[in-house]
Amino acid sequence: ERVAGLGGVPYVRVPDAKRALPHLAAALHGYPSERLRVVGVTGTDGKTTTSFLLAHVLGARRETGLMSTAAVRLGGEELGLEGHFTTPEAPEVQAFLARCAASGATHAVLESSSHGFSQHRLDAVAYAVGVVTNVSPEHLDHHGTFAAYVDAKATLVRRAATAVLNRDDAGLDAFAAAAGEAGARVVTYGQSPGVDARLLRVAEPRGALELTLDLLGERVVARLPMVGRYNAWNAAAALATAVLEGVPADAAAAALASFPGVPGRMQVIATTPFTVIVDFAHTPPALAKAL
């Protein structure tokens, strides 16, 4: 059956355009995620900061791209593609990955949202690693139930070869189960005994965090120029992932010291007679931690 009015224009008729589009976009660009190490970062809170931290630490040793809510970058270049959505539509995602691959980058960090998975924007991305920061109820207007929201986010660990999970978060079990069923390697972080990247000490001198970690068997000390104790967990996730991707533990820890921060994420603006902090705490747990 032909579509009326198209004349001689070639077209392909598919049952679901949303499902077909990411695969067509990936094919158009030569399946770029297969030429990169793609790390996805998801979670209710902390995914933007963790994505920035990871791109910074990886970028100290390797050319790395970053696509997030707050910025889209390749190496030190701002690409100016940021928009309203955490995860853009599939053609933009694939074009970004293709640009990373063409530039000689080895890694791309994608902030990966539940909407991005449920609306198939990320269907044709081959993930090497999936990082989950935490999970609490959000976007129930879209997903309908908390279980459906968690299941959408768990798509990341079902498709990644390695899952990096927050052992201290109450929602860990669902992601660990999904990763296990998919045969993914599970690496944990947090303060709980027995984790792979354990926060042994978190100190909060003015304007910074000082961290001592057992980082996949190696003890390291790191200084992060950010406020907010919860950012220690974001840093632990980034460090663990960077080490898994071949960055030496001491080099990864040292890279945190030069982290420039994230626009609108515990961003400190020193003024007189008071200090201004700009943050995006949009859920009850995030607001409680920020305050």
Model-identified regions with their sequence ranges:
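Conserved phosphate/oxyanion-binding catalytic-loop motifs
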Residues: 279
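Short beta-strand-centered segment that lines the nucleotide-binding/catalytic pocket of NTP-utilizing
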Residues: 61-75, 112
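Buried hydrophobic packing segments
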Residues: 21, 54, 58, 235-245, ...
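Acidic, Mg2+-coordinating active-site environments of NTP-dependent enzymes
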Residues: 3-8, 102-105, 110, 118-122, ...
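P-loop NTPase switch/communication element
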Residues: 70-92
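AMP-binding/adenylate-forming catalytic core of the ANL superfamily
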Residues: 282-291
